[in-house]
């Protein structure tokens, strides 16, 4: 039996009323059934007639029949107590919409939903709107007044603008020994010191007592005076250049020592200080310099690389530099030619054996020949050498003309023969120097204008021969006018010796060939002959 009905007092009352009505209906049915049975028993079928009594089914209109099962209504168990719960919040059961088949054969006692919810309620969170409280304007105004009064009357943090500590400035390095900022004098510092410790003038007593035995102001004054007296050489030698170069043979000359002749080379600087390189940059025990193996200029004396310098060539270099007064390596050629007008006349025979390699080496540092200055120096050397040659020829002619009437010395036949032999040797040397110089000038970076260089070499050779012949003719005429008539000058043809093969020993991209310096080292050439160059097309 389905017993899911609500057991409340009102429900029980309604149920009781329904049960009483049901019992009344049953009693009526039973009474009607009994009366019908009695009438049926009195009317037998033997008499052959049917009696129509008032209790017959045709005549009875108040017969109560049970409703059919298809019209059975399913009642909601909450409908009975719905009216009693209208004033309460609606809390639906979690199993309200769960499909459940009733246990028809169940005879155990079960609590209904209302009783279960009261005995064992579930935790259901209420809605958020139930906890929203509306603010009270009176209480809010009171709290704001109290907060503003607290921050106005009491100072929590003082303002940093009116802080008195900002007016006090900390002065560093206020000792009397330091120079003011306006004085821009250079401060002397020792290069060997890596860390400088600066202490305030007033020290704590314990620290002052601890440092007192280590401070010696009298020695510090001597050292400072010695450092002030030491000039540029000490600073130059103690700089980083010691680590980069081997400066054992480098002498730094002051501003007053510029007139002192140097041994190897003098390089002028804009500051007026000159640096003299004595010998090579690095004279090691093995005799090989650090830069000599890379440069085609082995040495400045025209000797083989292994020959030591015994001082024979230093005198020629000193005299030549003293007479020429060579300026900076990239000086204009006009200034040098003007100085050479007065200096070339006084050069003796012993000074005329400097090769072209010496002249070139005196103009730039002994570095690699493929330096960026190499091309410009080559052209400047050509123009300078050409003008030196012309000036020498002109000056020789002038000297012969001026001294033609006054006999300076007497010549003998033996001296004339020696002069002719010297002229022949000078012609041979001129030819070799011309060939070597043209070989060095033809070894350019690109083989452009090869034919033009060959034609220029031929013209140069012919002009040098003609100039030499004119010079010899003038000399013989001047000597004949002063002493006695001499024989007509015989043309000395250059003797063709063993042909020396000229080949390039480099890769073809160096500006100066090694064969050029081979000639200059083996044969002592004349200065005037070595200065022969192409005609004045590039001047």
UniProtKB/Swiss-Prot annotation:
GO biological process, alphabetically ordered: activation of protein kinase activity; asymmetric protein localization involved in cell fate determination; cell division; regulation of mitotic nuclear division; regulation of mitotic spindle organization
Residue ranges, compositional bias (Polar residues): 44-63, 458-467
Regions crossing the membrane: none
In-chain residues carrying the UniProt-annotated modification Phosphoserine: 383
Domain of life: Eukaryota
Quaternary structure (record): Interacts with aur.
Full protein name: Protein aurora borealis
Organism: Drosophila melanogaster (Fruit fly)
Name of encoding gene: bora
